[in-house]
């Protein structure tokens, strides 16, 4: 029985804000790709119907943690539909490598891994579509991790079209700050009227991120990290930050730059992959 479950990072290879709805949510167009790097969840089934998170996250109550919320949500829905074997529960612990507030999707990825893993371990039999629908109630980025394939996203991020962008090597850098998403989306200077374009058009254009100008303006650490990376390769913000990344054609080129990273920058090299490491394990 598999007990170690990948919870990979994602990059937004581009991110454009195309509008704002009456409910305050922003509409966007973005390109998600996974990294062969991330957290690892250790999940052991229990037979007493209890969910225990054995590695609490500092500053987050266990019941508020997306890991626990995802487990309880699956338990509730599977139970109500008669698909939860009696006594199903789990002990869950996490090896955390992805920073909070980094734009790498750590919390969303954790939630998706829990949904996929427990559906498998408990033998609930929910489809990927059902799991993705559950995931959306936990966060807009959860469905792409549940579905497990690189995707072009529209709407508020919930309309996904599978795509296969080039699988490049990336140097990903965390500048030491955490950026809450609302800080970026509430900024009055955030571009909110980027024209909508087709997938084909966007894939042929130079990639960029509408949130980058705000993150650089408000967080000097992000600005400094991007300024350094741009000396070596095309670089930009992922999500709403704080992580930034540079793209390379080979691992060796990325690692040569990593060796020159300033001490204040926490950085790693990873490959972009179109099939999630989580789903690769399940094949």
Curated annotation (Swiss-Prot):
What is the enzyme's main class?
Answer: transferase
Q: Which reaction does it catalyse?
A: 4-CDP-2-C-methyl-D-erythritol + ATP = 4-CDP-2-C-methyl-D-erythritol 2-phosphate + ADP + H(+)
One of the protein's GO biological processes: terpenoid biosynthetic process
GO terms for MF? 4-(cytidine 5'-diphospho)-2-C-methyl-D-erythritol kinase activity; ATP binding
Q: Does the keyword Translocase apply?
A: no
Task: List the catalytic residues.
Answer: 10, 141
Keyword Kinase carried by entry: yes
Q: Which Gene3D superfamilies match?
A: 3.30.230.10, GHMP kinase, C-terminal domain
Query: Keywords on this record?
Result: ATP-binding, Isoprene biosynthesis, Kinase, Nucleotide-binding, Transferase
Give TM regions.
none
Superkingdom of the source?
Bacteria
Q: List the pathway annotation.
A: Isoprenoid biosynthesis; isopentenyl diphosphate biosynthesis via DXP pathway; isopentenyl diphosphate from 1-deoxy-D-xylulose 5-phosphate: step 3/6
Instruction: Tell me which residues bind ATP.
Output: 99-109
State the EC number(s).
2.7.1.148
Q: Which PANTHER family does the record cross-reference, listed alphabetically? A: 4-DIPHOSPHOCYTIDYL-2-C-METHYL-D-ERYTHRITOL KINASE, CHLOROPLASTIC
Spell out the family assignment given in the record's similarity comment.
Answer: Belongs to the GHMP kinase family. IspE subfamily.
The annotated subunit structure for this chain is:
Homodimer.
Its annotated function is as follows: Catalyzes the phosphorylation of the position 2 hydroxy group of 4-diphosphocytidyl-2C-methyl-D-erythritol.
> What is this protein's name?
4-diphosphocytidyl-2-C-methyl-D-erythritol kinase
Supply the source organism for this entry: Salmonella enteritidis PT4 (strain P125109)
Q: What is the lineage of its organism?
A: Bacteria, Pseudomonadati, Pseudomonadota, Gammaproteobacteria, Enterobacterales
């Amino acid at each position: 029985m598999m007990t170690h479950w990948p919870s990979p990072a994602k990059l937004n290879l581009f991110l454009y804000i195309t509008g704002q709805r009456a409910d305050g949510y922003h509409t966007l167009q973005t390109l998600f790709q996974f990294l062969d790097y991330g957290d690892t969840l250790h999940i052991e089934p229990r037979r007493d119907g209890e969910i225990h998170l054995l590695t609490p996250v500092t500053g987050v109550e266990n019941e508020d943690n997306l890991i626990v919320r995802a487990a309880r949500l699956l338990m509730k829905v599977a139970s109500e539909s008669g698909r939860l074997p009696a006594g199903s529960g789990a002990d869950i612990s996490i090896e955390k490598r992805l920073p909070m507030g980094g734009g790498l999707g750590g919390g969303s990825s954790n939630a998706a891994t829990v949904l996929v893993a427990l559906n498998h371990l408990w033998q609930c039999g929910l489809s990927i579509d059902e799991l993705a629908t559950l995931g959306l109630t936990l966060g807009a980025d959860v469905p792409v991790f549940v579905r497990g394939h690189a995707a072009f996203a529209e709407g508020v991020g919930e309309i996904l079209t599978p795509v296969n962008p080039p699988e490049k090597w990336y140097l990903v850098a965390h500048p030491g700050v955490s950026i809450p998403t609302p800080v970026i989306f509430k900024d009055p200077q955030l571009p909110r009227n980027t024209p909508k374009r087709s997938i084909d058009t966007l894939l042929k254009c130079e990639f960029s991120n509408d949130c980058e100008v705000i993150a650089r303006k408000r967080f000097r650490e992000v600005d400094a990290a991007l300024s350094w990376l741009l000396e070596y390769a095309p670089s930009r913000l992922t999500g709403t930050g704080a992580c930034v990344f540079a793209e390379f054609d080979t691992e060796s080129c990325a690692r040569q730059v990593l060796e020159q990273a300033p001490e204040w920058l926490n950085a790693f090299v990873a490959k972009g992959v179109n099939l999630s490491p989580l789903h690769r394990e399940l094949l």
